[in-house]
Amino acid sequence: MSDTLIIKNPLIFLNESYFKKNVLKDDYKEGILNIIYKNEIPYEIFITFKDKNDLCEKFIKQYNNNFFEDEFDYKLEIEEIKDLDIEKEKERVSLLEEKYVKIPYQYEYEKIIFKDYENTLYKNGLIYKDEKEIRKIADGAKWLIKKLGTNLIQGKSVLRISLPVFLFDKRTLQEVLAYELRGAPYYLNHAYYSKNPFERLKWITVLLMSQCYISTFQTKPFNPIIGETFQCKIGDLNFYLEQTVNHPITANFYGITDKKNIKIYGYIIYDATIGINNCYAIRTGKFFIEFDYGQKYQIRTPAVLLQGIVGERLYNYIDSGLVLDLTNNYASYIKMNPDEIGYFKSFFTNKQNSFPDRFIGQFCKLNDLIYKEDDAKHELKKNSTPIIKIEGAWTRDIYFDGDEYWNVDDNQLFTIYEVGYVLPSDGRKREDYIQLVKGNIEKAQEEKEKLENLQRYDRKLRADYLEKNKK
């Protein structure tokens, strides 16, 4: 059976001693191959191989094939590799890589799920165990109740309430979306090069579900201001976002690969409503994926339920996720936590009989689906016939008709790079964001309030203008 290998520098690894020393380990199965473009942007690619000779041949073929003919510094022949000055090549690659700066993040968010959560039977969600963050959340709840009162909080969108900055994540909402798409170059390229429509649908479903486990942070991202932007490069995907509406918070986005063969685009509407002791978060809008040979898809993420603003804190995905094949009229339907205990049943028991991260689903015809525009409570019509069955756990794996397509241990996440032409409107240039990243909480709160007052003033000016110009 073939393995997938990640290699850090594209030419160095072909030196036999380096290959044996750094790659041929018994448990080493996954990795990223970074190739440097002429324009010096790192690009990550994956090669499936049987042995070293097979790997070398495939590497040369892929390095020189027509897909990349205009992209690389030079073409390679096998003879050239044998005579390569490894140390010189290592220095050259290192100098190129130094020109691209990884965007620094507070955490490796993909590791939070393993470090701070406990996944057990008989619960409706994963138990959050970070006591420091739990105390911080409790302090935020007390602050909110003191400011607004319990009755005023219930049913409100948490995104419309001015929260204290000590609850904030060191990312904007736009950065969060980009971070969740770190697997997109890998899974979308798998889908793009698949000839079978169901195979494409599988890989886009993997993209949808592989985002879940890296999104379990409990801190609140910065709400972007109208006109605020974020740009980055994720593998071969150039990604751009702009905040276009304040209420409800809406971000328009566009992403395109270097070869312009894959693009993603649309808009996302965010909302998070506070209940008695929980928070229900959802994204609606339109998220499209388009391939240059005419295939078009739409994805919808499941909702998130945070229980225990006070007391034991649980995190889980609920309702359903979707991938719609708009070209071939198929759908991939995912039902999250299918054994969830409902409100009525909770009066008699607080235990469910499966792990809360479990999901089931199926491929079906598009007209067998009841699609909900404004929430994630999509359903299958009665007597819907499954074409392919889906099962798995969002913290761990996904299977299609019993074949594993994704495992968290093998998840392919790409580095997010800064681009060299960041707009002045980039959210990371906000003063409150800058102060929070520096750890100056009081100053960050002060700057946040200044920006909020400016937004209120701008909103008043717009309202006054509309009133004045009524026909």
Language-model features: where?
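Canonical RRM/RBD RNA-binding surface and closely related RRM-like beta-sheet modules
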Residues: 3-5, 10-58, 62, 66-71
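Structural signal for hydrophobic/aromatic residues that build the beta-strand cores
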Residues: 5-7, 23, 33-35, 47, ...
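Generic detector of low-complexity/intrinsically disordered segments
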Residues: 7, 13-16, 26, 35, ...
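Functionally constrained cores in energy, signaling, and assembly domains
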Residues: 10, 14, 18, 55, ...
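Low-complexity RS/RG/RGG-rich segments used by eukaryotic RNA-binding proteins and nuclear co-regulators
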Residues: 67-85
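Extended acidic, Ser/Thr- and Pro-enriched interaction/regulatory segments
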Residues: 82-189, 193-471
